Amino acid sequence: MYTDYEGRQHRFGQRHNACPNSLVYRKYARALADKLAERYASNPHVTCWHVNNEYGITCFCDNCQNAFRVWLKDKYKTIDALNKAWNMEFWGHTVYDWDDVVVPNALSEGIGTEKTAFAGISIDYRRFNSDSVLECYKMERDAIRSHNADVVITINLMGTFKDL
């Protein structure tokens, strides 16, 4: 289950409720796409696949925090490069270890309901989240393609949704 900007882990019952970096979610999302594609691969009435619906959840859980650190290491290579890119000397926010990096939410540098005091971490977290959601799409797409390489696969996004 996903954790919102305020740090609250949600429970069952909402329309979008999965963390895109949850290994459990990914396992079952892939399995579901695989089983459906296997069953309907040769059905002539299936002309295309719609994967997920309106991707766009931004999760702030421990899975995301750990994956964000890995994403940052890949992008910046060193803590010094990260500190420079984010101008972390400002207000004495220098980080000395990758484990010092926390998700930018209301429990860390939050200002208001959706932004933080440091643009660098906020922008990178949105980029990371976009990459995480893209990985989920590709995972489901590839599961479908393994049964029907030529089928059209699509998604839909909300035109005014700013998080991707």
Protein language model features and the residues they cover:
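Polysaccharide-binding and catalytic clefts of secreted carbohydrate-active enzymes
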Residues: 2-164
